[in-house]
Structure formats: C-alpha cells, structure tokens
C-alpha cells in the first residue's frame, strides 16, 4: 500500500519492486510457510490454519495488486535467478521460494500482458542492457556506479550478491 501511495505522486519512476512482487512473496509464503529455508526445500512444509487464512487474504490482495500493476507499470525488467543466496541468515527465503516466486511473477506478467525484459549476466552486464533497453543517458560509467553502490552497501552491512 505504501508503495502505491508513493508512486501515485510521481509522473514517472523506476522502482526496485512492485505491488506484484509483494503479492507474489505473500502468495508463495502461504504455500511454503512464513520462513522458508532448506527444510522447506526438502518438502518439510507445515501449513497452519493461519497460513490458510492468509492465503485467502492474499488472493484478494492479488486482484487489487494486479489491477494496480496493469494500470501503473509500463514494463518490467526481470532479473532471473543467477546467483546463489548469500549465506548470511538475513533472508527468510530458500531456493525453492526463489524459484516459485520467479515462476509466479512471470506467469502473472504474461496473464496481465505487461511487457517485460529478462536481463541476465553480471551486475555490470545487467546495467548495460537495461540502459540500452530504456535508452538511459549515463551520468557516470557503469564501473563507477557499481563501485559506489558496493561502498554504500558496506555501510549498511549488506552481503553483496553476484560478485
């Protein structure tokens, strides 16, 4: 909801996620549990009554999120899963969670007929491809941008994926 409010005040924007991402994560959590981990990947999943109820809530949220996405987003850049999860203990997800989320997002984008570009490769390659797709004028080199981002990430104790 907060995302939609912020986006509504802008003429145009680039975002690192969407209402669809939030809905997808919620739906997959109702399937795999609130804290999917390696045990989840082995098939050890216990779905409580609370999760079953949450699934119904998420289905309803999904119709709103889908309508909003269809009206708001011109296109998506989809970054496929190419890097392993960082073993930092901060991400309450598993490889199975990532795969299911990835698949549901792509199915939903197709269902809604929202155009998307699948952009893979190293961080630098991804940035180059995205800049070309959207004809973005660089204000610094990609190498400089990545270097600055990595330095900033260190300030937040963020484990850097895709090195």
Predicted regions and their residues:
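Short, solvent-exposed loop/turn segments at secondary-structure junctions
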Residues: 19-22, 82-84, 123-124
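Two-component system phosphotransfer/interaction surface
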Residues: 124-140
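Secondary-structure junction/capping motif
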Residues: 15-19, 122, 141
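Generic secondary-structure transition motif, activating predominantly at the C-termini of alpha-helices
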Residues: 1-9, 28, 81, 134-138, ...
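Conserved nucleotide-sensing/catalytic segment adjacent to the nucleotide-binding pocket
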Residues: 1-40
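A glycine- and Lys/Arg-enriched "phosphate-lid" helix/loop adjacent to the NTP-binding pocket
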Residues: 30-121, 138, 144-148
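PAPS-dependent sulfotransferase catalytic core
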Residues: 142-163
């Amino acid at each position: 909801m907060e995302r939609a409010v912020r986006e509504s005040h802008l003429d145009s924007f680039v975002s690192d996620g969407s209402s669809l991402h939030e809905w997808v994560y919620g739906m997959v959590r109702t399937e795999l549990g609130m804290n999917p981990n390696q045990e989840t990947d082995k098939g050890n999943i216990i779905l409580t009554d609370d999760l079953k109820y949450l699934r119904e809530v998420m289905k309803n949220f999904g119709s709103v999120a889908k309508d909003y996405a269809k009206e708001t987003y011109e296109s998506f850049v989809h970054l496929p899963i190419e890097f392993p999860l960082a073993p930092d203990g901060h991400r309450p997800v598993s490889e199975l969670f990532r795969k299911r989320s990835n698949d549901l997002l792509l199915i939903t984008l197709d269902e809604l007929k929202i155009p998307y570009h699948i952009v893979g490769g190293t961080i630098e390659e991804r940035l180059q491809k995205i800049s070309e797709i959207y004809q973005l004028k660089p204000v610094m080199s990609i190498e400089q941008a990545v270097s600055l981002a990595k330095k900033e990430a260190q300030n937040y104790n963020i484990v850097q994926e895709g090195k």
